């Protein structure tokens, strides 16, 4: 990948020196590295933020590459971080912390375990750091190196990871106790504790372990709310709790802290989506998507591109920004080289049924993606008056649900659950269309039970909720009290989403609750300010 370099003279010379330094070799027995490590790692003068950590080195270039490496670590861009730390080693072969950084980069992190072949690389790096530390590291640096050694030394690929993670957290805890004012030490300790928790699922904010993590991160952010790594972790540690709003203040700073890191650009939306700041969620992920594209020109760091687009279309769907959501769905298809399911699902959300019918199908054999396609086609045909055709697509979904392999899943959600939801919505709408409203309500309610049973995910696999269908039909059969309850639950799940606010206003007016309805209308006006769609119900 061609990456451009510009900036101060000593940094402009970095890339030119890389090949010569590499040719001279490093005096260690580094295990075989991924092929990308044969290429020089550039120093990015476009995309990095101001964050730095001074280390023991006489080389400005080594310091610069170390700073780049730690910013990439805070951005979860681990492979490029490891490459940056190795470039720092080439500039100063006595830099103990440059080897520490590489060892850190090969380890497990919030979004994944150690990669294949990573352990011997990490061991080689930390061995070198230990060798250099007595003469080329400060006291704090030696303590960090010793703690990182606990993570890797004396173990094999068969050593239980939990035992390793526990020992590492205990070692890092001792470093933290002696250096609580050091923000990066605090980050490393908090990260080590978070690795002991399940990555997915809801976190109980009352648990002592979670409170400890929050306390450490809050202490760091009280000193410097712009610390990118700690805010990143704080968002992850609060998003699935009952108080995701605790991270709003730092989220407002995080997105621009490492301007070219798409994951950092995107991360505030994990908080914004939970608190209903959908417009901000859209902007965060648009910025991330731009960084992903800029990375092709050496001006950004791309990671999790499909996730950024998924979050973008999800936030835009809840914000009423149909054009943005649909385009993000199309970009998702291109970015993944996969099926067109989000192109279909965004069009269902925004009532673009003629567009769905004009789409050419793909040949996906994935039972979930095929069902999403069938759902969109069936729904569009139903709205076009083709009830029998819609029934045919519903039957395909139901057959697919029965025959899908038990292991079939999307983002950790089973085929049975996801097909049960979209099949339930389509079934309910078909029943409603033919006047069997009581059965339609039952179908929506069954689908809602499945939806409520899905594990925590950010974002959810579907960019809409069954509640918007259930609430709409309850209003149609003159059951506004029940509809109000449905919409209030929908707003609790997805605060300030315009679809459910619209339904709630209707339900309140139907009960004669004029004052509450007017207040809801004001909230809707603000929440729906960026919407490009006019709606008459909470679903098309």
Where are these regions (language model features)?
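TPR/TPR-like (Sel1-like) alpha-helical repeat modules
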Residues: 103, 107, 117-134, 282-291, ...
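Alpha-solenoid helical repeat scaffolds
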Residues: 66, 100-101, 187, 232-233, ...
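Solenoid-like repeat scaffolds
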Residues: 90-91, 176-178, 221-223, 253-260, ...
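Amphipathic alpha-helical repeat scaffolds of TPR domains
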Residues: 60-67, 94-106, 136-157, 181-201, ...
């Amino acid at each position: 990948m061609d990456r451009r370099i510009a900036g101060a003279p000593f940094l402009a010379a970095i890339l030119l020196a890389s090949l010569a330094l590499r040719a001279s070799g490093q005096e260690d027995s580094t295990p075989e590295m991924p092929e990308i490590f044969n290429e020089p790692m550039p120093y990015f003068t476009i995309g990095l933020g101001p964050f730095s950590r001074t280390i023991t080195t006489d080389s400005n270039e080594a310091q610069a590459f170390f700073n780049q490496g730690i910013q990439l670590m805070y951005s979860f861009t681990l492979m490029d971080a490891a490459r940056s730390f190795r470039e720092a080693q080439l500039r100063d072969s006595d830099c103990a912390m440059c080897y520490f950084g590489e060892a850190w980069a090969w380890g497990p992190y919030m979004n994944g375990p150690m990669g294949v072949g990573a352990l011997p690389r990490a061991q080689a790096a930390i061995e070198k750091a230990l060798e250099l530390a007595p003469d080329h590291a400060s006291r704090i640096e030696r303590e960090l190196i010793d703690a990182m050694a606990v993570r890797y030394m004396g173990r094999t690929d068969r050593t239980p990871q939990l035992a390793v993670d526990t020992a590492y957290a205990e070692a890092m805890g001792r470093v933290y106790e002696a250096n609580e004012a050091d923000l990066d030490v605090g980050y490393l300790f908090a990260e080590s504790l978070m690795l002991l928790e399940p990555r997915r699922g809801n976190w109980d904010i009352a648990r002592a372990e979670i409170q400890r993590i929050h306390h450490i991160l809050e202490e760091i952010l009280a000193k410097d709310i712009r610390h990118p790594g700690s805010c990143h972790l704080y968002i992850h540690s609060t998003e699935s709790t009952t108080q995701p709003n605790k991270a709003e203040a730092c989220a407002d700073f995080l997105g621009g802290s490492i301007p070219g890191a798409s994951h950092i650009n995107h991360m505030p939306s994990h908080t914004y989506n939970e608190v209903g700041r959908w417009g901000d969620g859209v902007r965060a992920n648009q910025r991330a998507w731009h960084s992903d594209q800029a990375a092709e020109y050496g001006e950004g760091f791309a990671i999790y591109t499909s996730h950024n687009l998924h979050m973008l279309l999800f936030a835009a769907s809840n914000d009423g920004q149909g054009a943005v959501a649909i385009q993000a769905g199309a970009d998702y298809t291109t970015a993944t080289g996969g099926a067109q399911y989000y192109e279909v699902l965004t069009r269902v959300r925004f009532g673009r049924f003629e567009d769905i019918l004009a789409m050419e199908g793909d040949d996906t054999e994935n039972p979930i993606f095929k069902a999403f396609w069938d759902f969109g086609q069936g729904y569009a045909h139903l709205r076009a008056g083709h009830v029998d055709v819609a029934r045919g697509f519903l039957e395909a979904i139901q057959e697919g649900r029965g025959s899908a392999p038990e292991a079939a899943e999307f983002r950790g959600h089973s085929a049975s659950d996801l097909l049960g939801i979209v099949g339930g919505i389509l079934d309910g709408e078909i029943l409603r269309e033919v006047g069997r409203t009581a059965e339609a309500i039952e179908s929506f309610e069954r689908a809602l039970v499945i939806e409520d049973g899905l594990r925590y995910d950010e974002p959810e696999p579907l960019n809409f909720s069954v509640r918007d269908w259930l609430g709409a039909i309850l209003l149609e059969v003159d059951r506004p009290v029940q509809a109000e309850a449905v919409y209030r639950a929908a707003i609790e799940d997805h605060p300030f989403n315009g679809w459910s606010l619209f339904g709630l206003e209707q339900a309140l007016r139907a009960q004669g609750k004029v004052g509450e309805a007017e207040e809801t209308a004001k909230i809707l006006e603000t929440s729906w300010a960026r919407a490009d769609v006019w709606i008459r119900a909470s679903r098309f």
